[in-house]
Every structure is written in C-alpha cells, then in structure tokens.
C-alpha cells in the first residue's frame, strides 16, 4: 500500500512510519520540521520519500496525495502553553491545514486516519470518558482539535472516509517536550540526579498509552472497513502525576522528593479513557503498561549516568 504520513518526523509519526515500512508499505513523509526532527527518521531514511513542507500548502499536499491509498495525518501544533500565545496560528495549522487534507482526500476518494485528542473532553466529571460524552475544551489547542473533529463529521457526511483517534497521554521513545512530555521531563531530571518538577499539587490524573499501541490503533483504523468513527486511544487505567514522579524516583534508587511548581494554565485535571469502542470495533487493545516501561527506561537512564 502507498501512504502519506503528515508530521512524520514527530514523536508518533516517526514510530508509525517505521511500522509501515516494516510491513512493506510505500511511505511519503510530509513534515515542516518546526518540532519534528529529521533524526527521528534515520532508521528508515533510505526507504521513504521525505518532503519538507507544510500542510497549509494545498498544491504540494495535492501532488503528494494523488495515487495513494490513504493518509495518516499526525501533523499539528501541540503545545498548550503556546496555544494561548498564538491561537490564530494554531487554528491556521491545525484546522485549516486539516481541512486541506480532508478536501483532497475526498476528491481522490482516499481514507484519512488523523490525530485527535482527549483534550476535546476538557475537565469532565464523567469518568472514564466515552467518545459520545460532552466536549468542553479548556484551551485554544484543544479547541482546534474539536474543530478538526467537527470538520471530520462534516466531510464524512459528504462521503469522506475518515477516522479520528483521540489520543490520551502517549508516551515512549522520541517524545518531545512539546507533546505534553511529563515523562520525558521527569526522566531528564533523574538523569541529572535532580528531583522531578511537578506542576501544581501533582494530583492531575492521567491515562498513559504507549506510542506502539497508538501506532497499532492507526494501522488497524486504516485497514478496517469502518468509514467514519472516533476512537479513544488510552488504557482504561490511570495514575496521578505525583505518583508517576514518585514511581520514577523509586525505580532510580535516588533519595529525592518531587519539587512542586505553580499550576499551568489550561491543564486538564483528570483524563481517563473508556476504550470499549476501540476494543470492539478495531479489535485493538493496549499491550504496554507504563510501570513496566518506566522500570526499563529508568534502568537505561541509570546505565547512562
């Protein structure tokens, strides 16, 4: 199969490309490298076609998407803090850029699987959260993700095959600081022999899902016969940010205590995914637990000290 992957030099996109190449698929990668890193593509650099450009460039997108079987749309501006500072640019990239992809995909009759976000639910009291629960985004970034979902709904009614994956807190190798990378930040502090820095009281609850599981959800969505749907991509299990920090400290064997900082504006208090629909319709389920992965990651950090 032939695919375009937008945002392919980023965290999730680069892992997705590796899996597609391993399957024998032909992959074209589009990334403007604003936050993506070309070194993320090093393992597959000789097996892909890389184009440095922007999803807002309609004609470039159109030329790349002609004669492919599908598009994995991972490109986005993702920093919640930056979204308060430059909301117009976030809308332009995340919403207008996505609509370009939907328009062209509809024209060519190809399927799109794209990155949505659990942030569309906002601070909900309904836990675990299902795909049909109320959407109350609390920051400009999350609002752009909800607008993308509304566009998907609109284009699906006009014949586009499109699946939106509402990622919860994805973690794993190559995670960027921009991508809500609390685990990466904590591990970097431990590597320096320093205590993790926790925003606010640390009682924020998170549902962490490994990047390999997110990749599998993308591929299952593309290969499925489902024409239009939204799926939560999480684990049905949660941990507080403070407990996460203490777990990393425990695995490190260092005598440290987390340092608390002021809370961050736009930070959702609790996220927990109900993944029943993804399990039933995609036959998908997460395979990597955060605790097991962290034990290995902290060991790697200690070995590199």
Functional labels for PLM-detected ranges:
Residues 1-170, 284, 297:
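N-terminal Rossmann-like NAD(P)+-binding domain of SDR-like oxidoreductases, especially those catalyzing
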Residues 15, 86, 104, 124, ...:
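Generic structural signal for alpha-helix termini and adjacent loop/cap motifs
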Residues 146, 161, 170-185, 194-195, ...:
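Glycine/proline-rich active-site loop of Rossmann-fold NAD(P)-dependent oxidoreductases
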Residues 147, 151, 155, 186, ...:
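Hydrophobic alpha-helix immediately C-terminal to the catalytic Tyr-X-X-X-Lys motif of short-chain
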Residues 211, 261-286, 296:
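Conserved C-terminal active-site "lid" loop/helix of NAD(P)H-dependent oxidoreductases
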Residues 214, 218, 233, 244, ...:
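Non-catalytic, hydrophobic alpha-helical segments
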Residues 240-252, 293:
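PAPS/PAP-binding and catalytic site of the sulfotransferase fold
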Residues 290-305:
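Amphipathic terminal alpha-helices
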């Amino acid at each position: 199969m032939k695919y375009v992957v937008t945002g392919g030099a980023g965290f999730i996109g680069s892992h997705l490309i590796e899996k597609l190449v391993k399957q024998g698929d032909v992959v074209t990668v589009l990334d403007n490298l604003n936050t993506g890193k070309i070194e993320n593509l090093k393992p597959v650099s000789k097996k892909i076609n890389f184009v440095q450009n922007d999803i807002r460039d309609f004609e470039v997108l159109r030329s790349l998407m002609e004669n492919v079987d599908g598009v994995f749309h991972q490109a986005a501006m993702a920093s919640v803090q930056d979204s308060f500072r430059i909301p117009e640019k976030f809308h332009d990239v995340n919403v207008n850029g996505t609509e370009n992809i939907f328009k062209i995909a509809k024209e060519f009759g190809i399927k799109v699987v794209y990155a949505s976000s659990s942030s569309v639910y906002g601070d909900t009291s309904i836990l675990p959260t299902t795909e049909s629960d109320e959407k109350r985004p609390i920051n400009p970034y999350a609002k752009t993700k909800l607008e993308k979902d509304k566009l998907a709904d609109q284009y699906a009614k006009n014949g586009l095959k499109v699946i939106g994956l509402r990622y919860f807190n994805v973690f794993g190798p190559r995670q960027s600081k921009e991508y809500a990378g609390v685990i990466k930040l904590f591990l970097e502090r431990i590597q320096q022999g320093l205590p993790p820095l926790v925003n606010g009281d640390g009682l924020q609850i998170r549902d962490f899902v490994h990047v390999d599981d997110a990749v599998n959800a993308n591929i299952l969505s593309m290969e499925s016969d489902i024409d239009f749907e939204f799926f939560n991509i999480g684990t049905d299990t949660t941990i507080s940010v403070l407990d996460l920090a203490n777990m990393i400290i425990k695995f490190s064997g260092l005598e440290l205590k987390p340092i608390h900082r002021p809370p961050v504006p736009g930070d959702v208090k609790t996220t927990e995914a109900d993944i029943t629909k993804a399990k039933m319709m995609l036959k998908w389920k997460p395979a990597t637990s955060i605790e097991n992965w962290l034990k290995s990651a902290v060991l790697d950090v200690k070995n590199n000290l």
